[in-house]
Each structure stands twice: as C-alpha cells, then as structure tokens.
Regions:
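C-terminal beta-strand-loop-alpha-helix "lid" module of Rossmann-like NAD(P)-dependent dehydrogenases
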Residues: 166-215
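Active-site helix of classical SDR
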Residues: 113, 149-152
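The beta1-alpha1 cofactor-binding region of Rossmann-like NAD(H)/NADP(H)-dependent oxidoreductases
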Residues: 53-63, 95
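Conserved glycine-rich cofactor-binding loop
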Residues: 12-13
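Substrate-binding pocket helix/loop in short-chain dehydrogenase/reductase
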Residues: 89-90, 94-99
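A short, exposed helix-loop element centered on a Lys and neighboring polar residues
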Residues: 113-114, 158
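Residue(s) in the substrate-gating loop at a strand-loop-helix junction
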Residues: 133
Length: 294
C-alpha cells in the first residue's frame, strides 16, 4: 500500500518542523514547505522532502503543489501551519502590514486549500488541518490584526467543514496556547516597532510583559505535533484540538464569562505578570550588603 502524503507549511522552524517529523515517524510521506529551505536540511537528512513555497505568492503555491502532485500522485493531509503575528495598535500598524498579515495567515491558507482540493476530491478523501490559535477565540491586547486573522481561520474552517463533508474531506482546527517558538520574539518586535512609543506605549509594555511571563510556562512544540498526529491519523478526528499551556483554561473561561468580566480577568492577568517582572527586576538589582567586619 502506498504511503499517505502529507504537506506541512511553515516547516523550517518550531511547530512546523516538529509536525513534519511526527507525521514522518508515523509512516507518512511528508513534504515540508517554507521560504527558508536552507533551514530544513535536518529534515532532508531524515528523509522528509523539502520544497520552497511563499504562501503569500499565489503562483508559488500553485507551482509547488503541482510539483508535489506530479511526484507523489496524491495529497492526503494538508497542514496549514505557516503564519506570523504582527502585534500593534490598529491605529499605528501600517495598513500594508495589516494586509500582509491577512495575506499570509488567511488568503495564503485559502489559496493552498483551493489548490489541493481538486486532488482530494478526485480521491474522495483528504484532511485539511488548520493551525489556528487560542487567539482565534480569545482576543489579546494590541493584537487586533493577528487576532482578526485567526478568528477568520476559525470561521472559515467551520464553513469549509460543511462544504467538504460531501467529498469525504475532513477539516480540523488545532488551537495552540502558549508554545515555545520564535513567534513571540517576532510578534513583540513588530509591537515595539509600531507601538513602542506614543499613546499606546503603556498597553504595548503591558502585553509584552504578559507574553514574557507566559513564555516561561509555555509548552513545547511537541504538544501541537501530537494533536496534529491525532487529527491526521484518527478515523474520526475531532473538529478542534486545543493544546498547550493555558489553552483549555482560557477557552473555558471565555465561554462562561460575559465579555466585560472576561476583559477584567485578562486585565488582571496582565497586571499580575507586570508585578512578577517588577519583583524579579528588583531582586536582580538588589545590592548585596557588605560583609560584616569582625
């Protein structure tokens, strides 16, 4: 029996790389895709096939997927993992930066789905796994652009699940919480560039401090990869998998608390994070007393 074929975007680092390794170890023929092909040499060494893709370039998407279909003859699993977070106030983030955020996180995902669907429909089977975030259900301060893109993925996935059921194609969403990856450094760098000064500087510091503390308790990318394994390999996958530090707690509280009560809860969490950092800073800056002279 031929191996099932899986495609993983954003395969050059963190979560995507771990997903590719796990699917490969579970017996799939895996194609890891990224703009940074030189950072996937370790995947090549394992036997995972790597290819260039720029999900924001629709011609690149069509060309790469066409090459894979020509080589493998089928596509069983598409994992839409490529994406990034650009934090900053709506007012201060350049609209072109916001558009690019949506082009990568939403329209790139949609183009990939469009491109693999003819093959999956012909097979009368397939599985589309969209890596969203708890930010697709829980809004973060200064994260309107990123949060908006992830809320979009949640809704798109629900509608797509209804569309594709008739063809035997499953649609699954994975919602990571706090995960150790380079996502935070990129998101906070964008935040500092756009809103580090000016009227939103206080809010920028607040959310930056919160993410710094949350990162200390974040989960390894492996937990996301395991969820993708379940989504890809189960006969009857769940429609959603929430994984990682804080995911279940925050999603549960978001469901049961009224909007303003949840806002107050999140504000309290961020205040608590700032107190923790201030205490740590004070301890680091504390001058040891001189030894007593006897």
């Amino acid at each position: 029996m031929d191996k099932k074929v899986a495609i993983v975007t954003g395969g050059s680092s963190g979560i995507g790389k771990e997903i590719a390794k796990h699917l490969y170890r579970n017996g799939m023929e895996v194609y890891a895709l990224s703009r940074r092909v030189d950072e996937m040499n370790d995947l090549d060494d394992l036997g995972i096939k790597t290819k260039f893709i720029d999900v924001a370039d629709y011609d690149s998407v069509e060309s790469t997927i066409s090459d894979i279909v020509d080589e493998a003859g089928r596509i069983d699993v598409l994992v839409n993992n490529a994406g990034f977070g650009a934090f900053g106030s709506v007012e201060q983030v350049d609209i072109r930066e916001g558009e690019y955020q949506f082009k990568v996180n939403v329209f790139g995902v949609m183009k990939l789905i469009q491109t693999v669907l003819p093959t999956m429909r012909a097979q009368k089977s397939g599985r589309i796994i969209n890596i969203s975030s708890i930010d697709g259900k829980v809004a973060s301060l200064m994260g309107s652009w990123y949060v908006g893109s992830k809320f979009a993925i949640e809704g798109i996935s629900d509608a797509l699940r209804l569309e594709l059921k008739q063809f035997g194609i499953d649609v699954v969403v994975v919602e990571p919480g706090a995960i150790k990856s380079n996502w935070r450094s990129i998101a906070m760098s964008k935040l500092k560039q756009s809103s580090g000064d000016g009227p939103y500087a206080k809010s920028a510091r607040k959310i930056s401090d919160f993410f710094e503390v949350a990162y200390k308790y974040s989960s390894k990318p492996m937990v996301v990869a395991r969820a993708v394994d379940q989504a890809a390999l189960s006969k009857r996958p769940k429609t959603r998998y929430a994984v990682g530090s804080g995911a279940h707690t925050l999603l549960c509280l978001r469901r049961i608390l009224p909007d303003k009560a949840f806002d107050a809860f999140m504000d309290g969490l961020m205040d608590c994070a700032q107190k923790i950092l201030n205490k740590e800073k004070a301890q680091r800056n504390q001058i040891d007393p001189e030894p007593e002279v006897k």
